[in-house]
C-alpha cells in the first residue's frame, strides 16, 4: 500500500510467551500487570510500524480479561492498527492462549490502546487504515464510534481531575 494508507496486516505484531511461575499471582494465573506490560509493548510496535514517528501511550480501553492463563499455557499476543485520526491511532490487541498439554486454544483477553504522536501536527500525516479480513473490517468499522467515546471520556476525566484530592 502507499504511504498514505496501510492495511491492518502491515502493522501486525505477533509475540509468543510461555507462562512461567514468575508470571503468576496468588491465584496461580498470570498477573494482570504482566499482561498489561505485554499489551503496551506489542501495541507500541504496531503503532510504530504504522507511523514511524515518536508516539506515547494515551489510553488502554475496553480491557476485557476473558479467560485466565495458567502454567503450561502459551500466550500469543497479536496487535494491529484499526484506525487513525489527526494525531492519534488505535491499536487492537488480542491475547490468544494455548493449553500446551492438550493443544486447546482460547481467547484470553482483548483491548484497544490509543497512541498519540508527539509531533503536533503529525508529520507526515497519519495513514488511512484499510481492513482486509472479517475481523479487521468489524473492528475498523467501529473506530469512529470508539473515537467519539474516547473524546467524551477525556472530557469526563478533565472534570474528574478538578475534583481529585491530592492530600
Residue ranges and their predicted role:
Residues 2, 10, 30, 44-78, ...:
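Hydrophobic beta-strand-centered segment that forms part of the acyl-chain substrate-binding groove
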Residues 2-4, 8, 24-25:
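A short, mixed-charge helix-start or loop-turn motif at secondary-structure junctions
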Residues 3, 13-14, 70-71, 82-167:
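HotDog/MaoC-like acyl-thioester-processing domains
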Residues 8-21:
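Short amphipathic
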Residues 19-20, 65, 115-117:
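Hydrophobic residues in beta-strands and at strand termini
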Residues 22-38, 164-166:
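A conserved, well-ordered hydrophobic junction motif at loop->secondary-structure transitions
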Residues 24, 60, 117-118:
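Hydrophobic pocket-lining residues within nucleotide cofactor-binding pockets
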Residues 35, 39, 43-47:
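Buried hydrophobic packing segments
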Amino acid at each position: 500500500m502507499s504511504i498514505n494508507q496501510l492495511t491492518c496486516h502491515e502493522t501486525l505484531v505477533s509475540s509468543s510467551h510461555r507462562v512461567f511461575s514468575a508470571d503468576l499471582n496468588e491465584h496461580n494465573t498470570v498477573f494482570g500487570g504482566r499482561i498489561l506490560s505485554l499489551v503496551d509493548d506489542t501495541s507500541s510496535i504496531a503503532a510504530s510500524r504504522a507511523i514511524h514517528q515518536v508516539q506515547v501511550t494515551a489510553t488502554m480501553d475496553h480491557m476485557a480479561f476473558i479467560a485466565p492463563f495458567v502454567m503450561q499455557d502459551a500466550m500469543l499476543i497479536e496487535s494491529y492498527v484499526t484506525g487513525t485520526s489527526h494525531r492519534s491511532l488505535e491499536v487492537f490487541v488480542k491475547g490468544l492462549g494455548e493449553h500446551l498439554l492438550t493443544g486447546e486454544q482460547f481467547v484470553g483477553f482483548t483491548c484497544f490502546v490509543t497512541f498519540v504522536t508527539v509531533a503536533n501536527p503529525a508529520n507526515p500525516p497519519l495513514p488511512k487504515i484499510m481492513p482486509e479480513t472479517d475481523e479487521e473490517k468489524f473492528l475498523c468499522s467501529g473506530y469512529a464510534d470508539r473515537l467519539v467515546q474516547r473524546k467524551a471520556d477525556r472530557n469526563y476525566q478533565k472534570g474528574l481531575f478538578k475534583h481529585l484530592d491530592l492530600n
